[in-house]
Amino acid sequence: MSFRENLARARGHIVMILALILGLVLVLWLETLGEPQPDASAGPDMMQPFDDLDPLPLAIRGESSDRDMEHARIAWTYFQNNVDEGTGLANSVHAYPSTTMWETGSYVVAILSAERLGLIDRPEAHDRLDRAIASLSDLRLFQDVLPNKAYHTRTLQLVDYGNQPVELGLGWSALDVARIVGTMGLVQRNHPELAPAVEALLNGWQLDQMVDGGELIGTNVSDGNIRRNQEGRVGYEQYAAKAMMLFGFDVFRAYDVSGDLMVQRVEGQPIPVDTRLHRATTPAFVVSEPYLFDGLEFGFDDRSHRFATAIYRAQEGRFAETGKLTAVTESHLHEAPYFAYSTVWGGGAPWAVMTFQGERIDSRRTLATKAAFGWDALFGTDYTARLVDAVEQFADPAKGWPEGIYEETGAVNGSTTANTNAVVLAALAFKAHGPLVRVAP
């Protein structure tokens, strides 16, 4: 047999031997790379850092101080000034007659909180809620399915983000709709006489259209075309899922984080970060807001309590490291670009401040009023007390609480919004009575 014939017969063995050699070389090379980076992890054991974390105790005090009540009165002033007399809906920003389902949910939270704090009596709370529900029932829906992303608070017209009427609409936001649905659940528990009105409202919305395979689905309009897309990232997604669960919707994938979670270490704390991109281009944002809403409105579950503890501790840790008071979340801005996410982790880096479009604007990092009050209500530490002290001086008794303080300049971020003033009220109600889902005695 010739050499060539022997070589042909042996070629399978040669290929196998070469593969084994290459595999050995690859293993040896990988071993030279060392351990994975200590600040990031992903995989099946990603919950382990949170299992090892002791959640901070909640700080429900059982009563309101005189100072608490003064803070609450200032926050309620915003809604006294910004609710349309005809429709009973609240402006999302001071003197700007536009709202979303998210901000309308904030107004509902503000009413329930003001009632618990004794700022308004039960008949006034009932009347305000009844009027708001009636106007929500009168809304022209996007494609006759679900509420549009924005409405004019006086005319109830579908509008764009410039508050200009738009015939087709912008689509619906699954997160925003879930928030108003969740607050309707709070209304049913706290004002059962309004349960029939709530049921009639929600039965008029095709809520099943925003749930598909256990996920939350929103829509966008682009060049006249309507596109459906999964909505929500870790934090906001689970908060919205809890809201939908109040009405029996199967949102198991939205509530589950296991397939989309990675851990980034910030100030030594494990921070829960979504592996999915924001708007398909930018690493996802981690802010305080969804955890504040979850704790103040629904009460933490074990997982969200641990996530919230880590996110809070990272902010406290940044102060210990830099001396800069830190309470970060999403905020309106008093100047362009008018909205930013001050993150614990965002855009692939710690403490990044991001626009919705994914541009970085760290000069607009804000010590957020709502984060200061929210964390103080939930955890009540010496550090959270310092946060409240820092923002207290900027309260406007005639207007409400502003968004906060710009870290870089110390100047006030003078935008005044429904969200911030609602969170202040919810925080102060929580201090005295616990989460809103718990029916007040």
Where are the regions a protein language model picked out?
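Ser/Thr/Asn(+Pro)-rich, low-complexity disordered segments
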Residues: 2-441
